[in-house]
Amino acid sequence: MSDPKPTRSQGDLAETLELLLDKGVVVNADIAVSVGDTELLGVELRAAIASFETAAEYGLDFPTGTDMERVTAAAGVDADDSKSVLERPDPPTTEGSE
């Protein structure tokens, strides 16, 4: 009897990528290197990976120069709702918090 071997179809990568872009992924990472009480290095990573359609549905901001008419049309957002996607208010800032 032969040993079972893992199988992989050609569509695995494409299907995984499609699912990832359809649902979206958010990565948050905080890395700190310290010696004693002294922080030597600090890295904060915030990344969101999604298709334009998914990002528009969740109201994420887009880089300058993005053709927002195509994005809202692809996301199925109504013209009235597109203002909420196109014109996001800036997040409130807290002065003196540092």
UniProtKB/Swiss-Prot annotation:
Other comment: Encoded in a 14-gene locus called c-vac which produces cylindrical gas vesicles only in the stationary growth phase.
Q: Which GO terms describe its molecular function?
A: structural molecule activity
Q: How does it assemble?
A: GvpF to GvpM interact with each other in vitro, and may form multi-subunit complex(es). Interacts with GvpA.
Q: Which protein family is named in the record?
A: Belongs to the gas vesicle GvpA family.
UniProt name for this protein: Gas vesicle protein J2
Has UniProt tagged this entry with the keyword Manganese?
no
List the GO terms this entry assigns under cellular component, sorted alphabetically.
Answer: gas vesicle; vesicle membrane
Q: Where is this region: Disordered?
A: 75-98
Which gene specifies this protein's sequence?
gvpJ2
Location in or out of the cell: Gas vesicle
Alphabetical keyword list: Gas vesicle, Plasmid
Q: What does this protein do?
A: A minor component of the gas vesicle. Proteins GvpF to GvpM might be involved in nucleating gas vesicle formation. Gas vesicles are hollow, gas filled proteinaceous nanostructures found in several microbial planktonic microorganisms. They allow positioning of halobacteria at the optimal depth for growth in the poorly aerated, shallow brine pools of their habitat. Expression of 2 c-vac DNA fragments containing 2 divergently transcribed regions (gvpE-gvpF-gvpG-gvpH-gvpI-gvpJ-gvpK-gvpL-gvpM and gvpA-gvpC-gvpN-gvpO) allows H.volcanii to produce gas vesicles.
Tell me which stretches of the chain form a coiled coil: none
What PANTHER family does its record include?
A: GAS VESICLE PROTEIN A1, GAS VESICLE STRUCTURAL PROTEIN 2-RELATED
